Amino acid sequence: NLIFTKQAQPVVVTVLQGPKEFMRFHKGDETMENIKNLTILHSNDMHGDFLAENVDDHLIGGVSLLSGYVNKVRKEERNVLYCIAGDMFRGSVIDSEFRGISTIEIMNMLAPDVVTVGNHETDYGIAHLLFIEKCAKFPIINANLHITTNNARLFKPHHIVEIDGMKILFIGILTESVIAQTKNERLIGSFVN
């Protein structure tokens, strides 16, 4: 159980494990009709690898299966968010050849609600990442990458999704070790010291 506050009133979030993750918001002893479900679908570390693999005569992974699942849940449930926690790039021959552009085009079809920058998003360089962000039809966020000469943020630091009267805040942060990997980009830094 996680505890959040909304207008100074405690709100408990219960995450139920299973094929889907449901978050139920409880305030005191309210009746079931006042409880809202929020389904959060999450993926990360796709690394530009979009093909399913045959494991024990079953297809595992792949964007077509992921897309089918995300679309199925979006049709069956109310209040569904799909989020990607980075590392969309670098790992497949196709992604490397097209430097992430092919990946972004496929991600656009998945229509995530929000994406954070992961450690491999910087592999093609910060300037290319900013170009790729312009190709995305979804928000890409990061709160701590900035230009060292003027402290200008490279990305929007957060994204708020409003759904069924709920406001869900997403914040994207890279660790210092990831930022250190971009050391050849001397003008890029972090607000974290």
Task: List where the protein language model places each region.
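Cationic, low-complexity basic patches in intrinsically disordered or flexible, solvent-exposed regions
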Residues: 7-10, 22
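Short, low-complexity intrinsically disordered segments enriched in A/P/G/S/L with frequent Arg
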Residues: 12-14, 18
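Short, Lys/Arg-enriched N-terminal segments with co-localized hydrophobic residues
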Residues: 19-31
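Acidic, metal/ion-coordinating pockets
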Residues: 28-193
